[in-house]
Amino acid sequence: MEYKLKAFCISALLILLQVNEIFAESGYELWLRYHLIEDVALKRYYQIKNSSIVFTARTQKQLVAKTELYNGLKGLLGFTIQETHDVKDNCLLVGNVESSPLITSLLCAKELDSLGDEGYIIRSLQIEQKKVTVVVAQKDQGLLYAIFHYLKLIQTHQSLDGVSVKEVPQIKYRVLNHWDNLDGTIERGYAGYSLWDWERLPFYRSQRCVDYARANASIGINGTVLNNVNANAKSLRTEWLIKAAGLADSFRPYGIRVFLTARFSAPQEIGNLDTSDPMNPKVKQWWRNKVTEIYEYIPDFGGFLIKANSEGQPGPQDYGRTHAEGANMIAEALQPYGGILFWRAFVYKNERYVDRVVTGYNEFKPLDGQFKENVFLQTKNGPIDFQPREPFHPLFGKMPNTALSLEFQITQENLGHAGHLVYLAPLFEETLQSDVYGDGKGNTVSKILQNYHETCGMSAIAGVSNVGTDLNWTGYLFGQANWHAFGRLAWNPDLTSEKVSEEWVRMTFSNREDVIDSIKRMMLISREAAVNYMID
């Protein structure tokens, strides 16, 4: 069996090396490779289907979307699309409800309302016997997502005849967690140093940070936590908030909101208080003042991520308070601004005779219903600590009155770092499709997350990032596939690993069937292979 696996991997890599266009590429473009289509007939087909465009861009995000579309089409088709104000045959109509009354009139109001802020429609229609393709959203953010999807259709050689796509994200907050330290190092990072050039911020605006935001937007990620969960209190000092605001300015055009981790003892460490007791009025006021200051610098600040009373981190239990009391105190400060709090449910102490597997469950289950409505309990996919295989965390299905956020680890802490090809979409899918049997059969983790979204509009999923300063972003090329897979499954938790992997291979390498089949197969068996050899 081992010999057959090695032989297959070698043959797959040989096929990969035959794909001429990957030579001399660094991997920097990720899955957004808008290279000229080589098939002459196919290229001509897409040129005809994009003969002209009606797209009036007025806002910053609309201009970003328009630039993305024009650059993508020019790269893929080798020409600049003709802009017009009149509808012509094979015209592309692009806009949102506010910017294009014409497009709005083509679709029913109920369907447009169902898109929300981030959903979109791509559809073939006829206007006065003229064939057109409509790309429409309610809001600018949805329009940007629609543009990326439209380019993906061409990039992956899909037919535009009779196209009908409607996409609405199933999870509201789709957030990367960066375990980046303020000195530029990354805990569990295997792809270089932090992308955030703190020493030169806020005045230096890195193109790489813009490209990072663009890549995230292309897969639907809409938030990023800048710093390590093992937090440094000085990240909340004014000079560091100004630096974070510089990053937020770079991310904002792509719809990426900035979050920060906060150290629970910050009132003592940087606020000159003698306590961080969440019931102390001075402590409460300190957090209110700090949050107000943050929103002055970052008006669309997302909120905080906090690790408390775990692995030596300070927390409310230091003062005899519960996790709910500690979380609610900070959540109250965030609430007037629409901010949210991710409170990690990964808690354990280095004590003998304590079953680490059940610690989180025992601490948080009794607190169900005691957390404020803008608090998420950020819960790892398994009860131990990002192992190659774990059952789903027992809190899922057992806290019906508390919003839980699912936390995956994209960086490969226990799966070979950046030295082993391990495709994580099967791991993500395994967790999401696990049946918790909380209310009978069919109550999967995915459904639990989506139910939060449907009932209270609060749903979230987080991924510990594998991104760094390496030119290929993730230390090795297939690490990009894990970043991509997280974004796609965060948008739609019911996608399959097979579908997501094929999409990534087509966008990153080639649309040749032999290349797709070989690389996809290698990816899909890699996680199971890693589990087997790491257990053995």
Task: Give the ranges of each region predicted by the language model.
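Bacterial N-terminal signal peptides that target proteins for export
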Residues: 1-9
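A cross-domain feature marking catalytic cores of carbohydrate-active enzymes
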Residues: 178-180, 228, 260-264, 308, ...
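Acidic, contiguous N-terminal accessory segments
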Residues: 22-128, 161-162
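Active-site-proximal beta-alpha loop/turn segments in soluble metabolic enzymes
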Residues: 233, 268-277, 307-318, 346-355
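Substrate-binding groove of N-acetylhexosamine-processing glycoside hydrolases
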Residues: 156, 296, 314, 321-536
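Structural motif
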Residues: 54-59, 93-99, 136-138, 180, ...
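Feature activates predominantly on carbohydrate-active enzymes
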Residues: 58-68, 72, 109-288, 292-305, ...
